[in-house]
Regions:
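HAD-like aspartate-dependent phosphatase fold
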Residues: 1-15, 19-137
Length: 137
């Protein structure tokens, strides 16, 4: 490996448009992941798309031939949870506008999801989101 690559210990890969497009894995993805494994370089997958849960991403990649566990994913949902815990640890009650699939991740992180008296409002991708809903929150 070239000198600078010898120092690399971890690679972070966006998913849609980087390792696959839609439901089609790029032909270079598996060889690249094998290249990393052979050299002891770890990798993790990133996404700013909150319309899928981490578990759904794990299954999506498994269906494309990539075996990886939830610990190898960092999504916008993960980031939001981490941000709230780090910057606003007093917040426990959330009003969540987002796809139903991400609700369990917030609940597993210890947040109570409520429509009444939330301490914070989280707005993520939701196919049925309307401005009037945000006004009611």
């Amino acid at each position: 490996m070239p000198g600078r690559l010898k120092q690399v210990r971890q690679v972070f890969l966006d998913m849609d448009g980087t390792i696959y497009h839609g439901g089609t894995l790029f032909p270079t993805t598996i060889p690249f992941l094998d290249f990393l494994k052979e050299r002891g370089i770890g990798y993790a997958f990133l996404s700013n798309n909150s319309s899928f849960s981490t578990a759904e991403y794990v299954e999506k990649l498994r269906g494309m031939g990539i075996e990886s566990g939830p610990e190898n994913f960092y999504t916008s949902t993960c980031y939001t949870i981490d941000y709230l815990k780090r910057k606003c640890p007093e917040i426990r009650k959330l009003h969540l506008f987002g796809m139903p699939c991400i609700r369990p991740e917030f609940e597993a992180a210890g947040f109570e999801l409520t429509d009444t008296e939330p301490q914070a409002v989280v707005v993520a991708f939701h196919r049925d989101f309307h401005y009037r809903d945000l006004c009611r929150a």
